[in-house]
Amino acid sequence: MRPYVFVNVAASLDGKISDESRKQLRISCEEDLRIVDRLRAESDAIMVGIGTVLADDPRLTVKSAELREKRQKDGKEPNPLRVVVDSRCRVPLTARILNDEARTLVAVSRIAPEEKVREVKKVAEVAVFGEERVELSALLEFLHRKGVRRLMVEGGGTLISSLISQNLVDEIRIYYGPIFIGGRDSPTVCDGESFLKKCRIEKIERIGEGFAVTARFNR
């Protein structure tokens, strides 16, 4: 058993999620950011790859105090569990995703340096999945056992590609902002090895100056 896996990502009209520097770019409009905050609040956990942590240093928390209060009234913690897919345990000890605003799980493989793992364990939960790379299916089963029923994935492109190619995504929502980024080395929504995966378009909606496409995959 695994959670319902929902991917949310913002991209340029040419499908890029950042430029060649891989630093965070503002693509979403204010209205879309409010929608993303609501989607976070409705999730049991939020997952990103280590590349996103190193590039953006995200908090991955619910920004709206009203939404955090609603979660608490529903018997939940103010913020969802944060999950980092980090085979080699490269997460900086100063990363904001390790702060005390929410619980954090760092998923590593057996090649992660033991000393670094011990340090990270002082501020977060660390669990091993796989020999050299994190086995995503095992991680999702682990999260389901922890009570995670809805998992929101926010990137980056390598993690999203791995999940979709392994049939581990149920739904994806892509917000397209009115910009072009270009660059053959700029990261895309799905990075990594090529694959073919069909989906069905559920909804296309205008949001601010951009639009969002929601699609589902057969489970």
UniProtKB/Swiss-Prot annotation:
Kinase listed as a keyword: no
Superkingdom in the source lineage: Archaea
GO molecular function: 5-amino-6-(5-phosphoribosylamino)uracil reductase activity; NADP binding
Pathway: Cofactor biosynthesis; riboflavin biosynthesis
Reactions catalysed, as given in the entry: 2,5-diamino-6-(1-D-ribitylamino)pyrimidin-4(3H)-one 5'-phosphate + NADP(+) = 2,5-diamino-6-(1-D-ribosylamino)pyrimidin-4(3H)-one 5'-phosphate + NADPH + H(+); 2,5-diamino-6-(1-D-ribitylamino)pyrimidin-4(3H)-one 5'-phosphate + NAD(+) = 2,5-diamino-6-(1-D-ribosylamino)pyrimidin-4(3H)-one 5'-phosphate + NADH + H(+)
EC code(s) of this entry: 1.1.1.302
Keywords: NADP, Oxidoreductase, Riboflavin biosynthesis
Functional description taken from the UniProt entry: Catalyzes an early step in riboflavin biosynthesis, the NADPH-dependent reduction of the ribose side chain of 2,5-diamino-6-ribosylamino-4(3H)-pyrimidinone 5'-phosphate, yielding 2,5-diamino-6-ribitylamino-4(3H)-pyrimidinone 5'-phosphate.
Protein name stated in the entry: 2,5-diamino-6-ribosylamino-4(3H)-pyrimidinone 5'-phosphate reductase
Protein's organism: Archaeoglobus fulgidus (strain ATCC 49558 / DSM 4304 / JCM 9628 / NBRC 100126 / VC-16)
